[in-house]
Amino acid sequence: FIGAALGALTAIPSIIKLFK
């Protein structure tokens, strides 16, 4: 579960870059 949460945390910045 912690690994999945960490993956989502690191994926958020990538998603933000996609929208910018």
UniProtKB/Swiss-Prot annotation:
Keywords: Amidation, Antibiotic, Antimicrobial, Membrane, Secreted, Target cell membrane, Target membrane, Toxin
N-terminal signal peptide: none
Entry superkingdom: Eukaryota
Subcellular location: Secreted; Target cell membrane
Expressed in which tissues: Expressed by the venom gland.
Record's function text: Has activity against Gram-positive bacteria. Has insecticidal and hemolytic activities. May act by disrupting the integrity of the bacterial cell membrane.
Family: Belongs to the non-disulfide-bridged peptide (NDBP) superfamily. Medium-length antimicrobial peptide (group 3) family. Ponericin-W subfamily.
The protein, known as: U1-poneritoxin-Ni1a
Species name: Neoponera inversa (Ant)
